[in-house]
Swiss-Prot record:
<comment type="pathway">
    <text>One-carbon metabolism; tetrahydrofolate interconversion.</text>
</comment>
<dbReference type="InterPro" id="IPR020631">
    <property type="entry name" value="THF_DH/CycHdrlase_NAD-bd_dom"/>
</dbReference>
<keyword id="KW-0521">NADP</keyword>
<dbReference type="GO" id="GO:0005829">
    <property type="term" value="C:cytosol"/>
</dbReference>
<comment type="subunit">
    <text>Homodimer.</text>
</comment>
<dbReference type="GO" id="GO:0006164">
    <property type="term" value="P:purine nucleotide biosynthetic process"/>
</dbReference>
<feature type="binding site">
    <location>
        <position position="236"/>
    </location>
    <ligand>
        <name>NADP(+)</name>
    </ligand>
</feature>
<dbReference type="GO" id="GO:0009086">
    <property type="term" value="P:methionine biosynthetic process"/>
</dbReference>
<keyword id="KW-0028">Amino-acid biosynthesis</keyword>
<keyword id="KW-0486">Methionine biosynthesis</keyword>
<keyword id="KW-0511">Multifunctional enzyme</keyword>
<comment type="function">
    <text>Catalyzes the oxidation of 5,10-methylenetetrahydrofolate to 5,10-methenyltetrahydrofolate and then the hydrolysis of 5,10-methenyltetrahydrofolate to 10-formyltetrahydrofolate.</text>
</comment>
<keyword id="KW-0560">Oxidoreductase</keyword>
<dbReference type="GO" id="GO:0000105">
    <property type="term" value="P:L-histidine biosynthetic process"/>
</dbReference>
<dbReference type="GO" id="GO:0004488">
    <property type="term" value="F:methylenetetrahydrofolate dehydrogenase (NADP+) activity"/>
</dbReference>
<dbReference type="InterPro" id="IPR020867">
    <property type="entry name" value="THF_DH/CycHdrlase_CS"/>
</dbReference>
<protein>
    <recommendedName>
        <fullName>Bifunctional protein FolD</fullName>
        <ecNumber>1.5.1.5</ecNumber>
        <ecNumber>3.5.4.9</ecNumber>
    </recommendedName>
</protein>
Length: 295
């Protein structure tokens, strides 16, 4: 079985991004800038934000973090976003989720300039994705990362049956739309399964490419996968494991041990899809910089 190594690909991409940033610095005297806004204190979010800032620095991009109090009014957050929209040194704006209950997440998404929406969540970017204008939009980073893995590993997709488990706005919906686009990494017949789907296994067994993004540990078992399928595991779930120092370990939405015996190729957890998300965020930020500077 081929292991689709997202950690390795993300490291390769970091070197490519670093070279591009340095080249643009020598040409324009400027570098891409990413600003992350975090509201309140969430340990997982803080770790993720630190990782983003660290990776930005490693590739030569400017990175800043704006930390706001938990009780920040929505109006103030929107003012901060507006100032970033107008700042020519900022090419990517990301508001870390989750947000406190007094803030409307959709209002925040709408407030970000689509040209700086490097998370790919703005309705304008989603609409362009659905219409196939991929050169004029930003694609949500996790689906975009999966497409990058498919392309770099030369996985044949055209005309194949792709089954996506999950319909979230962050992964499931954009993933399904990406996989039906006329691209060399997609061009599939796509089925979407979700919590109301009856007999999910009857669909997953038909999948040439199976993408699991539901947030349920080891949900996909070997009997749900056909021999020779390509399996992409988006899930990150922490389960109890008394054999580890922490007493827990990370697993995906797929039972790796069982499914790996049948799959032709598969992403591990950790080290598969996860590392690609930040890499694609920086790639989107680079694209925003290129568009802003006519490069």
């Amino acid at each position: 079985m081929l292991i689709i190594d997202g950690k390795k690909v993300s490291l390769d991409m970091k070197e490519e991004l670093k070279a591009s940033v340095e080249s643009y610095r020598s040409i324009t005297g400027k570098v891409p800038g990413l600003t992350v806004i975090i509201v309140g204190s969430d340990p997982a979010s803080e770790v993720y934000v630190r990782n983003k800032a660290k990776t930005c620095k490693e590739v030569g991009m400017n990175s800043s973090v704006i930390e706001l109090q938990e009780d920040t009014p929505e109006a103030h957050l929107l003012e901060v976003i507006d100032s970033l929209n107008r700042d020519p040194a900022v090419h990517g704006i990301l508001v870390q989720q989750p947000l406190p209950k007094q803030i409307d997440e959709f209002a925040v998404t709408l407030a970000i300039d689509p040209a700086k929406d490097v998370d790919g969540f703005h309705p304008e970017n989603l609409g362009r994705l659905v219409m196939g204008h991929l050169d004029k939009c930003f694609v949500s980073c996790t689906p975009y990362g999966i497409l990058e893995l498919i392309g770099r590993y030369g996985i044949e997709t055209s005309g194949k049956h792709c089954v996506v488990i999950g319909r979230s706005n962050i992964v499931g919906k954009p993933m399904a739309n990406l996989m039906m686009q006329k691209l060399k990494e997609s061009n599939c017949t796509v089925t979407v399964c979700h919590s109301a789907t009856k007999d999910i296994a009857s669909y997953t067994r038909q999948a040439d490419i199976l993408i699991a993004a539901i947030g349920r540990a080891k949900f996909v078992t070997a009997d749900m996968v056909k021999q020779g399928a390509v399996v992409i595991d988006v899930g990150i779930n922490r389960i109890e494991d008394p054999t580890t120092k922490s007493g827990t370990r990370l697993v995906g939405d797929v039972d790796y041990e069982g499914v790996s015996a049948k799959a032709a190729a598969m992403t591990p957890v950790p080290g598969g899809v996860g590392p690609m998300t930040i890499a694609m965020l920086l790639k989107n930020t680079l694209h925003s910089f290129e568009r802003a500077n006519g490069l």
